[in-house]
Curated annotation (Swiss-Prot):
It comes from Clostridium acetobutylicum (strain ATCC 824 / DSM 792 / JCM 1419 / IAM 19013 / LMG 5710 / NBRC 13948 / NRRL B-527 / VKM B-1787 / 2291 / W). Belongs to the UPF0122 family. The lineage of its organism: Bacteria, Bacillati, Bacillota, Clostridia, Eubacteriales. This is UPF0122 protein CA_C1753. Disulfide bonds: none annotated. Gene3D superfamilies: Winged helix-like DNA-binding domain superfamily/Winged helix DNA-binding domain.
């Protein structure tokens, strides 16, 4: 299950580097959880052709990630954001000054709006 989620993230990140047909088949397989025979029927092709396309795209997506590391960086940034928010929550509990609590709330809001 973990690999399917990872591949779905790779597809969302690098899908624009694939052809429209490749993206369509990969989304049907990874996001919509259709079987290869079901996808083959929808695309008027063979199960083997779909299998080959999925394997080829899988390899391409992993290759893009190995070179660019965008998903890895995204996950690392999300972990850092969570860690900062956890620390702010602890700090907020310890502070009694209303102005400082408000400042912490603003910092947390800024962290939530940050994305790469």
């Amino acid at each position: 299950m973990e690999e399917r989620i990872y591949l779905s993230m790779l597809l969302s990140t690098y899908g624009s580097l694939l052809t429209e047909k490749q993206v369509n088949v990969m989304r049907l397989y990874y996001d919509d959880d259709l079987s290869m025979p079901e996808i083959a029927e929808l695309n008027n092709t063979t199960r083997q052709a779909i299998h080959d396309l999925i394997k080829r795209c899988h390899k391409m997506l992993l290759n893009y990630e190995n070179k660019l590391k965008l998903v890895e960086k995204y996950k690392r940034n999300e972990d850092i954001k969570k860690d900062i928010k956890d620390k702010l929550y602890i700090l907020k509990d310890k502070i009694q000054d209303k102005d400082n609590v408000q400042l912490i709330d603003e910092i947390e809001k800024d962290i939530n709006s940050f994305s790469i």
